[in-house]
Amino acid sequence: MKGNDNMLEKNNLIFIYGKAGNYKSSIGVSLLNSTDKKACYINLDNNNHFKINDNIKVFNEVSDIDFIKKCISDYSIILIDYIELLEINNDELLELKELVKNENKTLIIISCCSNNKELINNSHYVELKEIADLMILTDR
């Protein structure tokens, strides 16, 4: 899909954000499957029900941010599903953003809004929005 490639090329840091069960992972995997670039899927949420294209490398275990940095150097598009499982702070997110920007890569991060919060009227959303090049919100 040419439109998705264009969106992925123009945005270094993309957040897919929403409450649990709002198809965030489906959107991220669809973006990955639509590109022919070297890509990887960091599947921290143990999603086994998705059909991932054979050319996409899947990692199910990640120990720390250094592994993500290595993925950024090795792949053009990196999908992390979902970031809260790594307990990465905002300074580390900014560091990752700078790295993908400098290397002209795309990092797609799935982030979950707590079910007891409003989708966009919370501090977590505001923090992510300030550093994202693109926010994709899901709400049903």
Where do the protein language model's features map onto the residues?
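N-terminal pre-Walker A segment at the start of P-loop NTPase domains
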Residues: 1-7
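Conserved catalytic network of the ASCE P-loop NTPase/AAA+ motor domain
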Residues: 8-9, 34-35, 70-73, 98-104, ...
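Conserved P-loop
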Residues: 8-70
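Structural motif
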Residues: 15, 77-81, 108
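Conserved nucleotide-binding/hydrolysis micro-motifs of P-loop NTPases
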Residues: 45-48, 84-86, 113-118
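Conserved P-loop NTPase "ATPase switch" module shared by AAA+ and STAND
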Residues: 71-89
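Substrate-engagement module of ASCE P-loop NTPases
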Residues: 90-117, 129
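Phosphate-binding/switch region of NTP-binding enzymes
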Residues: 112-140
